[in-house]
A protein has these predicted regions:
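Short, glycine-/small- and polar/acidic-enriched structural segments
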Residues: 30-215
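Short, low-complexity disordered leader/linker segments with a strong preference
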Residues: 1-36
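Pocket-lining segment of extracytoplasmic ligand-binding domains
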Residues: 219-221
Length: 221
């Protein structure tokens, strides 16, 4: 019985191998040549565009029959509009942008995201002068700050700005980008109102009732 079972299993495995090989050949034939060989890809000068730069320098695009031009863009909106209008064939862009286009939050369009270039790693940073004011409110261990640092440590600083009649400004890359969401979550969790959007009232600034003002600053700046 064991010998017979072994023979049956071997036959099944051989047939599976044959079927997989056939499927692979069929899929390869179905793909065919590139529909367009010359491509212009936009990018913002950030480290997460590195896969595109490496592929360009190492000749990986040409290995696939593609002749790619990489073109730096001044900000995310220019890049996004370039993809929508067809000026760019593709681009390194913020992960929520295709979702925003599909749902009509921005310009309504079908944007396909075939590849993820990064894991959305990010950090919240403050100016040295702001950190000096925050530091007394931050827990320390062996002379080093205990992470994660809550925005509660920033709250007294924001309050001192308010009393002095000065706005407390924070920058983020794009309204629909994860940077905006993460900053707002961090501030709110620490007791600082980040403001809210009120499109029904014609206010898309995201600063209604804000204690800290978030504004768009393109990455190159």
């Amino acid at each position: 019985m064991r010998v017979q079972s072994s023979r049956v299993r071997s036959r099944v495995l051989r047939w599976v191998a044959v079927l997989l090989a056939a499927c692979s050949a069929t899929a390869e034939a179905a793909v065919g040549p590139p529909e367009k060989e010359g491509l212009k890809l936009g990018f913002i000068k950030l480290t997460d565009m590195a896969p595109l730069a490496i592929a360009y320098e190492k000749g990986y695009f040409e290995d696939e029959g593609l002749y790619v031009t990489l073109e730096a863009q001044s900000n995310w909106k220019v890049l996004f509009d370039g993809v929508i209008s067809g000026v760019l064939d593709g681009a390194h862009m913020l992960a929520p942008m295709p979702l925003a286009a599909a749902t009509g939050v921005t310009t309504s369009a079908e944007v396909i995201a075939p590849l993820t270039l990064s894991y959305n790693g990010a950090a919240i940073t403050v100016a040295s002068a702001v950190w000096a004011e925050m530091k007394p409110n931050v827990a320390m261990a062996d002379g080093k700050p205990v992470h994660p640092i809550s925005a509660a440590a920033l709250k007294p600083v924001v309050e001192s700005y308010r009393q002095a009649g000065k706005p407390f400004n924070l920058g983020m890359t794009f309204p629909i980008g994860t940077h905006n969401y993460l900053l707002r979550y961090w501030l709110a969790a620490g007791g600082i109102h980040p403001g809210y959007y009120a499109p029904a009232k014609g206010d898309n600034s995201g600063s209604v009732d804000a204690q800290a003002l978030l504004s768009v600053v393109p990455p190159p700046q």
